[in-house]
Design a protein with these regions (language model features):
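Lumenal/extracellular ectodomains and adaptor appendage modules
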Residues: 1-223
Length: 223
């Protein structure tokens, strides 16, 4: 493995998306293992993988990391002819986020775990608007930046980390959305109308006066 780009993105709901874009050289294996410290298994909601052409790769969650214990592993099938670059994505619940007096603490894997050494691992912790990083504590040293790098990342790296950051009130909303009903209509002229019905559960002690939604850039007549 020549390079891994490890991105940890905190969403406005407090959920976390971890994506690892992996570049390999030489002959591709039939399958590929990636893991995290086992404690994060309780928060994983979904995993998916795709190659550089966005073709979905079969993925199995909750497998053994060879003979190593203490890891939550996932196996990705690599079909013949796949590209040398592929991405693995995990969605974690907002249970990895806890409140502080002026913001939050994020419990996350500082690096992914592999069965072989990684030449270079680049890490980016992507926080929402209205937040400011205070520091990241990890086993190989603390940093006060949202980006850091590790050369020659050892196989079976076990590295939980904690990111502490301040946040403007209301920018992160501790909620769950258990149901979403979507209805899409296409008119004879080709116009598309989409109606979403959400059920939102507020997990915080304060009330929610507004909620942030991401819409397509070409969306119009939003009500």
């Amino acid at each position: 493995i020549t390079q891994v780009d490890h991105k940890v993105e905190v969403l406005y709901s407090g959920h976390v998306v971890i994506s690892d874009t992996i570049t390999v050289t030489g002959q591709l294996p039939d399958s590929f293992l990636i893991g995290f410290p086992y404690k994060y298994s309780a928060f994983i909601l979904k995993g998916t993988a795709y190659d550089s052409t966005y073709k979905i790769l079969p993925m199995t969650l909750g497998v053994q990391m060879q003979s190593q214990s203490g890891f939550y592993g996932s196996s990705i099938d690599i079909p013949s002819g796949s590209s040398q670059v592929f991405t693995i994505v995990f969605i974690l619940s907002n249970g990895v986020l806890t409140t502080t007096n002026n913001g939050y603490k994020l419990d996350f894997p500082a690096y992914p775990s592999f069965v072989t050494t990684v030449s270079q691992c680049n890490v980016n912790v992507d926080l929402p608007t209205g937040t400011n990083i205070i520091g990241i504590d990890k086993t190989d040293g603390s940093v006060n930046s949202t980006t850091y790098q590790k050369n020659n990342l050892p196989a079976f790296t076990y590295s939980p980390a904690t990111a502490t950051f301040s946040a403007v009130y209301g920018y992160i909303q501790d909620v769950n959305i258990p149901t979403l009903n979507r209805q899409v209509n296409i008119s004879p002229s080709g116009a598309i109308t989409c109606t979403d019905n959400y059920k939102i559960i507020n997990n915080s002690t304060s009330s929610i006066s507004s909620f942030i939604f991401n819409l397509p850039p070409t969306a119009t007549n939003v009500v």
